């Protein structure tokens, strides 16, 4: 914002002003408005009688301070709304504690209890498709990269789908306890599609980070709410 003062006018009181394209800002809208009015009064007092400030110029300068004040109020309002949204998201995130979620990842855990007759259980796995597929295949490998099972899932619609592996290898034997990897391929009419594998994780807590609320997934680290594809 600029307010011109005739620097050669002998009645110039020495009020600090800006000329040309310079700008002046206050710490907030109230300070800026006070400074603006002070300078405007000084300009009116010190204006050249042969070239007085025109009404349209005065209107323009008053409109400028109104705009700045309005923007300051708008920023305050937006800040309050943003805070309410953050609080709402924090509350939403805390409701997930203790729940299982499907997030992007390739891990399946297999385990069998020590008691007699216990069966092997596995964590769910899933896939997210942006387009429908007429052929979807899941390949499970062990920590050494050896294929232990290939699952022909078949046709799937676009969206998120969740499955459970029975923990058996191709030969029908049960896999040892441990961590396994899942790779998923999808195609439609012979054209390869993007297939995002999903892994299961248990939400153990919620923390606040620079990117917002973070879900604590234990050994899987942390993730944002945006990464959650399904709640189980």
Curated annotation (Swiss-Prot):
Does this UniProt record's set of keywords contain DNA repair?
no
Gene Ontology biological-process entries: bacterial-type flagellum organization
Q: Where is this region: Disordered?
A: 1-26
Keywords (alphabetical) are: Bacterial flagellum biogenesis
Gene3D superfamilies referenced in this protein's UniProt entry, alphabetically: 2.30.30.910, 2.60.40.4070
On whether Calcium is a keyword of this UniProt record, the answer is no
Q: Which family does it belong to?
A: Belongs to the FlgD family.
Q: Which InterPro entries match?
A: FlgD, FlgD/Vpr_Ig-like, FLgD_Tudor
Looking at the UniProt entry, the stretches that span the membrane are none
According to its UniProt entry, the function of this protein is described as: Required for flagellar hook formation. May act as a scaffolding protein.
* Chain intervals with Low complexity compositional bias: 11-26
What is the name of the protein in this document? Basal-body rod modification protein FlgD
């Amino acid at each position: 914002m600029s307010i011109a003062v005739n620097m050669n006018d002998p009645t110039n009181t020495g009020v600090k002003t800006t000329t040309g394209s310079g700008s002046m800002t206050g710490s907030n809208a109230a300070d800026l408005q006070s400074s603006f009015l002070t300078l405007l009064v000084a300009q009116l007092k010190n204006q050249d009688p042969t070239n007085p400030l025109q009404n349209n110029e005065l209107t323009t300068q008053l409109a400028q301070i109104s705009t700045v004040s309005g923007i300051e109020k708008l920023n305050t309002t937006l800040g309050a709304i943003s805070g309410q949204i953050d609080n709402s998201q924090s509350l939403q995130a805390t409701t997930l504690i203790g729940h299982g979620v499907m997030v992007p990842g390739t891990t399946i855990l297999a385990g069998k209890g020590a008691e007699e007759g216990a069966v092997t259980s596995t964590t769910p796995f899933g896939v997210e498709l942006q387009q429908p597929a007429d052929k979807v295949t899941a390949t499970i490998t062990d920590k050494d990269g050896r294929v232990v099972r290939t699952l022909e899932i078949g046709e799937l619609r676009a969206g998120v789908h969740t499955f459970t592996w029975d923990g058996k290898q191709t030969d029908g034997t049960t896999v040892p306890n441990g961590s396994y990897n899942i790779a998923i391929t999808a195609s439609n009419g012979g054209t390869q599609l993007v297939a995002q594998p999903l892994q299961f994780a248990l939400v153990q807590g919620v923390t606040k980070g620079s990117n917002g609320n973070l879900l604590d997934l234990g050994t899987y680290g942390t993730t944002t709410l945006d990464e959650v594809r399904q709640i189980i």
